[in-house]
Amino acid sequence: MIIAITILAIAIATLVIGFALGVAYRKRSYEQALDVATQTATGIIETAKKEAAASKKEAIIEAKEENHRYRSEIESELKERRSEIQRQENRLLQREEILDRKDTALDKREDVLEKKEAQLDSDQKVVTKQKEQASLLVKEQQDKLEEIAALTRPEAKELILNETKEELIHERAVMIKESEEETKATVDRKAKSLIAQAIQRSAADMVSETTVSVVNLPNDEMKGRIIGREGRNIRTLETLTGIDLIIDDTPEAVVLSGFDPVRREIAKMALERLIQDGRIHPARIEEMVDKATKDMDAKIREIGEEVIFDLGIHSMHPDLIKTIGRLNYRTSYGQNVLNHSIEVAKISGILAAELGEDVILAKRAGLLHDIGKAVDHEIEGSHVELGVELTKKYNESETVVNTIASHHGDTEPKSVIAVLVAAADAISAARPGARSESLENYIHRLEKLEDISNEFKGVQKSYAIQAGREVRVIVQPNEVSDLEATVLARDIRMKIEDELEYPGHIKVTVIRETRAVEYAK
């Protein structure tokens, strides 16, 4: 019994000790878990703080960048607005100058009218006085005759009238002759004064057009890239533009040679962009030439708009403005046609102001008098006929149309402005150094060479190059075969020999190119 109690006591004691140890172990485990959880939470908090700081820093940087972009946009917009305001101010100043000139012209007209009125009053007084003197003289002679001669009153009256009539006829003839001589002297002096004044006020520098352009290179290594493998790049550019590329020993420079200023400018723009881009191969060259051609159209329109704005001309058809811009790339006897037209417009305006005519209309007619020269190399007909058709097409006034038709004496001028423009045209063209016959003949020969080639069937376009020593003819591959290309070259050669006079030899090159293009999708 005692043993059983002892065993039971030991068991109970063991249970109590085990329970105490279990409680202590679980408490320690809880404390360790709590420490781990505390450390984990602390780590999460630190990580969250770091991420929050980084996010805050990124947000601050983005805000600064956004602020900088916004400020840049605002500054750019302000700059554009200032530029627009400046342009508007310049236009207002120019309009004020035009109005001032109009006021001056009106004042001059008023002065002339006042002088004429004063002269008329003076002449009227002289005539009245002469009539009174004649009446007194007639009366004296009548009385004298009645006293001396045994004449009746009607007989005496008839005698006196006959004598007076003869005297008056003689005096009138003398006065008319003196007036004519004085008028001629005055008119010649006034005309010379007006022309001299017009030339001085419209004096313009004139430089004879050249047939070459120079493109600067960053280094001489670029010449090899422009030439390309086996010369394919230079051949592609010459074929697309019709301009000769001359690459010689000149350091860091390439020369573009061609008689057509538009094609030469397109070639220059394309080559400069290729050099700047660095990628020079046939496909890229073709892309740049197309882009330069489009940019050239925009540049031509901008030139036309600038010209009519400078001259104070308004309400002109956009296509006619573009045609005016094309005159900048046409020459007549070596004289730039656009500069010549501007000079004629200014001289016409000055002469019109002196004579009391419409200054703006005179400038408009003067500017458009050679407008046909912008298209005479594309359409058959003289520049006078083409100019008349263009101005009628774009609803220009009858005065402008008649001015164009009559400025070379083909038709009768119907207005004072038409006569003034013809005179201004003669003044601009006849002054020393304005024109050069040799350059005009040279360009005409090259244009004729291209026209002969373009007359044949299947020809897409042709270019006269090498100063007229070679003509390259590009044909449609679906219309002209390889065998027909050989025959075409011979036919063109024979027609050139029959219709054109030239020194040396002319090489005829027919180019037939076939392309097969597919797109992989």
UniProtKB/Swiss-Prot annotation:
One Pfam family cited in the UniProt record for this chain: HD
The record places domain KH at 211-274
Keyword field contains Metal-binding: no
The UniProt entry lists membrane topology as:
Single-pass membrane protein
Gene Ontology CC entries for this record? plasma membrane
What are the BP-aspect GO terms? mRNA catabolic process
Segments passing through the bilayer:
1-21
- The enzyme's E.C. designation: 3.1.-.-
Source organism, top-level taxon: Bacteria
Keywords attached to this entry: Cell membrane, Endonuclease, Hydrolase, Membrane, Nuclease, RNA-binding, Transmembrane, Transmembrane helix
Its main localization is membrane
Residues annotated as domain HD? 337-430
Question: What Gene3D superfamilies does its record include?
Answer: Hypothetical protein af1432, K Homology domain, type 1
Subcellular location, in the record's words?
Cell membrane
What biological function has been recorded for the protein in this entry? Endoribonuclease that initiates mRNA decay.
- Which family does the entry's similarity section mention? Belongs to the RNase Y family.
Concerning NCBIfam families, the annotation shows:
HDIG, RNase_Y
Protein name stated in the entry: Ribonuclease Y
